[in-house]
Regions:
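Non-catalytic protein-protein interaction segments used by genome-maintenance enzymes to assemble
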Residues: 2-122, 132-154, 166, 170, ...
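C-terminal tails and terminal domains of large nucleic-acid-associated
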Residues: 166-228
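A sequence-level detector of short, solvent-exposed, charge-rich linear segments
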Residues: 72, 122-126, 141, 149-153, ...
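Extended acidic low-complexity intrinsically disordered regions
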Residues: 1-2, 204
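Alpha-helical solenoid repeat scaffolds used for protein-protein interaction
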Residues: 127-131
Length: 228
């Protein structure tokens, strides 16, 4: 399976969480600045992975996908929701669709509630846009996992969360960063931005950071789980 990313940009063993910090506050869903236009996003490669990750969150969000050792040497279970939040925050990335960001923020806020089940929570969510999307994500029982070739046993996605979720995250991050870089270059050619030194420098700094993320993800893709 593809190795998750760590905060210092070195691979961890599969099954470890990326710079996991359960107490880290999750940023508000409207704080993410993207250069990718909302229009036409559904046709983009990153959007396919974004939706698959969201499907994992709504279906299996509270499920433990791996353990991580804390500073005291204790094994701490990490849920799908915690893993996704931590992995995105590490590179200051987020989902592109505002509704998807809202769902992830809600999931992160309630993951430690007693008896929390992502599927039940989002199906009963008062905002009809969220509950409707949740129905779509849950009712479409599309499996990324295939038959095991030797035993013909069906391996479920839930049994492979420890490898599927990191692989989806690597594919998503590479795709969305590549798209952001393209639109950043266009933004820098806009005279209004090119003539504003502060804006220009801020974009150039972020561009440099994203190029580094892109490079790391490109290396990880060489060892990825094959996904459709």
């Amino acid at each position: 399976p593809a190795a998750p990313t760590t905060a210092d940009a070195t691979p961890t063993a599969a099954g470890e969480a990326p710079g996991h910090n359960a107490d880290a506050p999750f940023p508000p869903e409207d704080s993410y600045i993207s250069f990718i236009p909302q229009e036409g996003k559904e046709g983009q490669e990153f959007y396919k992975y974004e939706r698959l990750i969201l499907q994992m969150i709504v279906r299996y969000g509270e499920k433990v996908m791996c353990n991580v050792t804390n500073e005291e040497g204790q094994e701490i279970p990490v849920s799908v929701i915690e893993y996704v939040v931590s992995d995105l925050k590490q590179d200051e990335l987020s989902f592109h669709n505002p509704l998807h960001r809202q769902i992830l923020t809600e999931a992160a806020a309630h993951i430690h509630d007693a008896g929390f089940t992502a599927e039940r929570y989002f199906l009963a969510y008062p905002d009809p846009a969220i509950s409707k999307l949740s129905v779509e994500l849950i009712s479409n029982r599309y499996q990324l996992s295939k038959y095991h070739s030797k035993s013909q046993k069906i391996v479920t996605d839930e049994e492979r969360l420890y490898e599927l979720v990191p692989a989806l995250m690597i594919n998503f991050k590479y795709a969305i960063v590549s798209e952001e870089l393209k639109h950043m270059m266009s933004a820098l050619q806009d005279p209004a931005i090119a003539n504003d030194e502060e804006k220009c420098n801020a974009i150039m700094k972020r561009y440099s950071e994203m190029r580094e993320v892109q490079s790391i993800m490109a290396k990880r893709l060489g060892d990825r789980v094959v996904l459709p």
